[in-house]
Amino acid sequence: MRIGHGFDVHKFGGEGPVIIGGVSVPYEQGLIAHSDGDVALHALCDALLGAIAEGDIGRHFPDTDDKWKGADSRALLRDVYRRVKEKGLELGNADVTIIAQAPKMAPHIKHMCAAIAEDLETSLDNVNVKATTSEGLGFTGRKEGIACEAVVLLVKKSY
């Protein structure tokens, strides 16, 4: 078994929507990023890479490389998961916590879980996404951006 933890944050700016958990969430602003700014999938990528001791998302998809400009984070997640499988591992479960005062995530959580489960080739009962606020505190509380944490458990492939 291997455990990984990931964290990501992006600042609001420009036009919406917000892409998070592989889902387009309507909002008046988007997130400033080199790729599509999907904090949930970026945190998940970092958790997976950490679990296999392969660094972080910046090492594999650097924001200094125009190849990744505007990249679809679902494609990045699938690429990272390919690396996981190459190590003889598969997802046991993933738990994602989105920290945002806005936009409201609840109506989109099921769709996020479905997108993540699809990209990680697993069943819905192995993926959990939840959202919380910071009770008006800090940059997320002031609606300046969104943060996300992710934890994964990887297990040996069951073939």
UniProtKB/Swiss-Prot annotation:
Cofactor note, please? Binds 1 divalent metal cation per subunit.
Give a single Pfam family match.
Answer: YgbB
Question: What's the top EC group for this one?
Answer: lyase
Which residues are involved in binding 4-CDP-2-C-methyl-D-erythritol 2-phosphate? 8-10, 34-35, 56-58, 61-65, 100-106, 132-135, 139, 142
Task: Give the multimer and partner information.
Answer: Homotrimer.
- Give the family per the record: Belongs to the IspF family.
How is this protein named in the record? 2-C-methyl-D-erythritol 2,4-cyclodiphosphate synthase
Native species of this protein?
Aliivibrio salmonicida (strain LFI1238) (Vibrio salmonicida (strain LFI1238))
